[in-house]
């Protein structure tokens, strides 16, 4: 029939994915992520210069050599939530680690892979507390070196804050969030996610 025998196919495919990774070899251990500059797949166990101190996880390195050579590192942590981080080295200078999809814990600032006007975008989830009763309420967002608001989303009582009929106005400046309501919605709690740039970049 012209079809290859099953044994022939199995032999041709054997050892094409050593250790099951499909990346040419098992992950090589690395103790300092700054030293992982050759393209490859690495394992980290208490490694330095990772997204966290004593980083445990995996690292994928893509390296381009030559003039203006660039290295990209993608890291995934093995402990806790499986977060994905990215950073680059251009001419030997490393950028900070950035989140691809931050876990958005309340009150924590995350530097993301997004850019706005060639500046990194940060994200922070904020608990505003109870909505105001037919008045306005100011809450500090606690962001240092706030530069430009890029976008925001919000929930009030489990519904979209921006489209809520009881909300007249939402104002966000370098220090505070102000929400103005036209009726008593104080039984509802408000949560917002701000995306912004910083003056330090």
Give short role names for the model-derived ranges.
Residues 1-39, 90-123, 145, 201:
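Glycine-rich, low-complexity segments
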Residues 7, 11-13, 18-20, 29, ...:
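Intrinsic disorder/low-complexity segments
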Residues 11, 82, 106, 190-193:
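Coiled-coil-like amphipathic alpha-helices with heptad-repeat character
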Residues 13-83, 90:
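Glycine-rich, flexible loop motifs
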Residues 45-53, 57-65, 119-201:
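Extracellular attachment/recognition segments
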Residues 76, 88-89, 114, 155, ...:
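A generic structural motif
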Residues 83-93, 182-191:
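Short, compact, well-ordered microdomains
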Residues 84-86, 112, 169:
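Short, surface-exposed charged micro-motifs
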């Amino acid at each position: 029939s012209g079809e290859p025998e099953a044994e022939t196919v199995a032999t041709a495919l054997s050892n094409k994915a050593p250790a099951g990774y499909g990346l040419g070899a098992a992950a090589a251990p690395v103790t300092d992520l700054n030293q992982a500059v050759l393209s490859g797949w690495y394992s980290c166990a208490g490694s330095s210069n990772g997204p966290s101190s004593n980083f445990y996880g995996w690292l994928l390195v893509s390296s381009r050599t030559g003039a203006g050579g660039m290295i990209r590192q993608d890291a995934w942590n093995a402990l806790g939530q499986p977060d994905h981080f990215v950073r680059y080295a251009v001419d030997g200078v490393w950028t900070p680690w950035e989140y691809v999809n931050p876990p958005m814990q309340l009150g924590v600032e995350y530097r993301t892979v997004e850019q706005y006007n060639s500046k990194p975008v940060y994200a922070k989830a904020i608990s505003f507390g109870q909505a105001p009763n037919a008045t306005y309420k100011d809450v500090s967002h606690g962001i240092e070196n706030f530069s430009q608001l890029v976008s925001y989303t919000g929930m009030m009582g489990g519904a979209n804050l921006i489209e809520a009929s009881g909300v007249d106005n939402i104002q966000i400046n370098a220090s505070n969030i102000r929400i103005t309501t036209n009726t008593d919605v104080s039984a509802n709690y408000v949560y917002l996610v701000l995306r912004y740039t910083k003056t330090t970049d």
